[in-house]
């Protein structure tokens, strides 16, 4: 079989960590000679992995069957799953069934948090499914090259043979993993004597690439896992204790990303507040990053109690994007205490005040859970009032989902789904109003951003403050810009009018 005539379909559900890891797997697949595509965006890329051009938009559309390539040409479907809510797992099962239906001869390789906790249940969905634990997904770095060899050595594709071979290969790899790895020394006087770190830390950061097929803006995972014990959260069970990428490796990976021509990078992690390395905590690492790169830095998520006197001055730096997403969850002290969150409502107000003090009208978003066990109407009204008073430009509101293995699984009294749904509806209506108000406040103003790759003849720009706007060009300007280009635009209603292509965004 000819590897170049075979394709691998990649699907990602959940957080930016999953997106980062899926991008890295995609880059390895292109290195091995496969074509890569996703049902979210259609055909993605056949360009070599060392080509920095981005060829697919960032925003994922709702799940749909793809007709991008004939199903018989797809030898593997890679699915990175999420377990944050019951609906996330339901969505994963639905996607897996769609893949089985669309690609009846392909191996369905499922990994991620859901696969870490429910591998047997996932494999029971169909004989062609191989569920691989999320905490061992580093071993997947070996799969593309191995699969390419299998394809090249085979006259035709036999699903049972390929599934058995991949399963055996992964099993064999688990017995041959070295016990420790040595990090590379960094060429910086403030980072020396890098220590050897354990195999789990090495594993969790193995999937990494400076090249991105599905995103116009780079992603860098610097932390994984969580040491907290929030009553509702199952992610800590799936990803384990907090681990961090050593500072030397952070800087090395940033250097590789910057060399591709990237103008912006998002730092990702399960809980960036728990980043620890030989240079100190997250604030110390951020300071070092700002000293060693000229790229714009976007921070994926922060806890309100981490917006303190050591971090705030760094967030004022001009390279830090004026966009902050806070893991808030509730505006009721009673509910926050029951959730085992390490802060109270006053801390949230203080954090938002500090962010607005150091940045000019930043985009501030928040995660909110409605319907947590015991949440009264008064508790919810406190949360709603906080969201209104703090004028969050984005609110990610979702109903409480009881997760097996968590303390909240058995907490009483349960809030009826109907009531939780009403609260979500009210929060979503507020979010829509405040989002529109935030956009209106920027009408007529200039701002910089990164262009997304064309989709259906239209391009969008993601501004520094996280506005996603259709890009308007006049007839004298280029018909299409490359995804990833850095531009200056003027906000005009719900659109962005191109005013300048910035060749050097650091000037």
Region spans (language model):
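Conserved SAM/AdoMet-binding glycine-rich loop
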Residues: 108-109, 117, 258-380
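Terminal RNA-binding accessory module
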Residues: 410-507
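Residue-level signal for inorganic ion chemistry
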Residues: 78, 113, 267, 299, ...
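Active-site proximal loops enriched in glycine and acidic residues that flank catalytic Cys/His/Asp
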Residues: 12, 269, 301, 328-330, ...
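Short flexible coil/turn linkers enriched for glycine and charged/polar residues
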Residues: 214-215, 226-227, 330, 362, ...
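Short, solvent-exposed loop/turn segments at secondary-structure boundaries
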Residues: 88-90, 241-246, 276-280, 338-341, ...
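Extended hydrophobic-aromatic, low-complexity segments
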Residues: 324, 336-337, 348, 357-363, ...
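Proteins enriched for Cys/Gly/acidic motifs involved in redox and nucleic-acid/cofactor modification
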Residues: 1-268, 273, 310-313, 324, ...
């Amino acid at each position: 079989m000819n590897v170049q005539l075979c394709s691998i379909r990649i699907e990602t559900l959940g957080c930016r960590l999953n997106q980062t890891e899926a991008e890295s797997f995609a880059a390895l697949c292109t290195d091995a000679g496969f074509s890569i595509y996703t049902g979210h965006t259609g055909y993605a890329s056949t360009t070599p992995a060392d080509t920095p051009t981005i060829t697919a938009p960032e925003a994922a559309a709702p799940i749909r069957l793809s007709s991008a390539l004939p199903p018989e040409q797809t030898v593997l479907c890679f699915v990175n799953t999420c377990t944050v809510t019951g609906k996330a797992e339901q969505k994963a099962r639905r996607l897996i069934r769609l893949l089985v239906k669309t690609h009846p001869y392909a191996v369905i390789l499922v990994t991620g948090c859901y696969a870490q906790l429910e591998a047997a249940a996932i494999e029971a969905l169909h004989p062609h499914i191989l569920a691989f634990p999320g905490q061992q997904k580093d071993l997947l770095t070996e799969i593309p090259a191995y699969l390419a060899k299998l394809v090249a050595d085979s006259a035709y594709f036999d699903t049972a043979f390929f599934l058995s071979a991949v399963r055996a290969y992964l099993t064999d790899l688990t017995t041959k993993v070295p016990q420790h790895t040595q990090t590379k020394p960094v060429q910086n006087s403030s980072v020396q004597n890098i220590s050897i770190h354990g195999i789990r830390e090495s594993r969790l950061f193995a999937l990494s690439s400076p090249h991105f097929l599905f995103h116009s803006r780079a992603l860098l995972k610097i932390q994984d896992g969580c040491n907290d014990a929030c009553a509702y959260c199952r992610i800590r069970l799936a990803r384990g204790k907090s681990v961090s990428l050593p500072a030397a490796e952070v800087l090395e990976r940033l250097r590789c990303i910057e060399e591709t021509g990237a103008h912006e990078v998002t730092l990702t992690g399960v809980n960036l507040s728990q980043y620890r390395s030989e240079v100190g905590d997250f604030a110390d690492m951020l300071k070092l990053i700002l000293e060693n790169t000229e790229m714009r830095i976007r921070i994926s998520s922060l806890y309100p109690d981490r917006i303190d006197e050591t971090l705030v001055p760094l967030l004022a730096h001009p390279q830090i994007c004026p966009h902050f997403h806070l893991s808030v969850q509730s505006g009721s002290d009673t509910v926050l205490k029951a959730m085992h969150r390490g802060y109270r409502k006053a801390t949230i107000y203080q954090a938002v005040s500090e962010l607005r003090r150091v940045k000019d009208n930043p985009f501030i978003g928040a995660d909110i859970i409605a319907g947590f066990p015991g949440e009264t109407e008064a508790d919810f009204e406190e949360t709603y009032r906080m969201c209104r008073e703090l004028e969050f430009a984005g609110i990610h509101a979702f109903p409480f989902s009881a997760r097996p293995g968590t303390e909240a699984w058995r907490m009483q009294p349960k809030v009826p789904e109907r009531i939780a749904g009403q609260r979500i509806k009210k929060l979503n209506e507020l979010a829509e109003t405040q989002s529109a108000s935030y956009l209106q406040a920027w009408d007529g103003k200039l701002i910089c951003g990164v262009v997304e790759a064309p989709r259906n003849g239209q391009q969008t720009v993601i501004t520094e403050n996280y506005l996603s706007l259709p890009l308007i060009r006049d007839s004298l300007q280029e018909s299409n810009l490359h995804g990833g280009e850095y531009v200056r635009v003027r906000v005009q209603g719900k659109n962005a009018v191109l005013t300048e292509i910035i060749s050097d965004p650091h000037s």
